[in-house]
């Protein structure tokens, strides 16, 4: 199983599937469709049924039930795209057998080193087979490891018909990294009662709480006049933008928060004297505090408008997704089953909130309750990304164990 997982991850990683938030198509990039079509062929090859791909690149497939029992249909999902934070072009994965616990030179010429001094958890992987980058791209284990694990678990179940299970649905989706993963996902066609995204990080992660999330674009407009004759006339949009940001609570930013703490995150600032725009994301686990944060943004804008004029500041704010806990709590047994599956395999479940979102955040509000389980990866979205192949085996085994437990409980 381990070699199969490594082969799959490497072959998927080599397809550039970075999504693009400025594109209006679905999927947002052609590489995602290329990988989706590869996955369709592979699903057919391993013996999955009802394999489909729609015009938006959503792949679905079925493993039919092999039990007499009435078992609820469950699904497993992963996304094909990689993050916009770092290049996913020409990914060249490195396989390190029997990792010795020391520095890993990812790229000698560029002096890129993956070191336990910088990443202390790396030392815990001594003895593991690791898959790393070559120091010039991300790896794409987020979420191609999830795809590999789902595919390998399905192949295992097909090869072992003595393992009884209900109907299983599988889906591979585009554009998760730009928040659009579920936008064109056909929940009705998928037709599962519950599902799991296989999109978590280190071994044992089990998540059913996500942020409430909004995006805000603040546009500040000024009046540009020759600086030599600007007294009493110039209004500097860049300075209005600086005042806006300075009015937000300084310590409520990603670099100062953890656990259940929310934040305002300035993604980008662009502009000049005439016009400057600020792009933020707003995050909180608690719905009331989330709404308070959005109110704070609006109040600061209103104060600046009072000072500089009605058209000086505009706020364009929209909600992106909500904390899936609200939709999963009523069917908490799906979390309990995943918890028990890990325990059965001597994996210590690490139940913690996702300081982010998954496709499951939105799908849970679309009628498909969808917690998240680990892939085994670390340091997603950058050149220091790596994954333990040994823990990928454990993730695939957890999928198999979840399926068994649903059948046993029926």
From Swiss-Prot:
Q: Which residues bind Zn(2+) 2?
A: 142, 177, 381
Q: What is the lineage of its organism?
A: Bacteria, Bacillati, Bacillota, Bacilli, Bacillales
Q: What is this protein called?
A: Peptidase T
Main subcellular location = cytoplasm
Question: Per the annotation, how and in what number is the cofactor bound?
Answer: Binds 2 Zn(2+) ions per subunit.
Q: Name one Pfam family in it.
A: M20_dimer
Query: Subcellular location, in the record's words?
Result: Cytoplasm
Q: Which gene encodes it?
A: pepT
InterPro entries on file: ArgE/DapE_CS, Bact_exopeptidase_dim_dom, Peptidase_M20, Peptidase_M20_dimer, Peptidase_M20B
Alphabetically, the GO molecular function entries are: metallopeptidase activity; tripeptide aminopeptidase activity; zinc ion binding
Q: What is its EC number?
A: 3.4.11.4
Q: What does this protein do?
A: Cleaves the N-terminal amino acid of tripeptides.
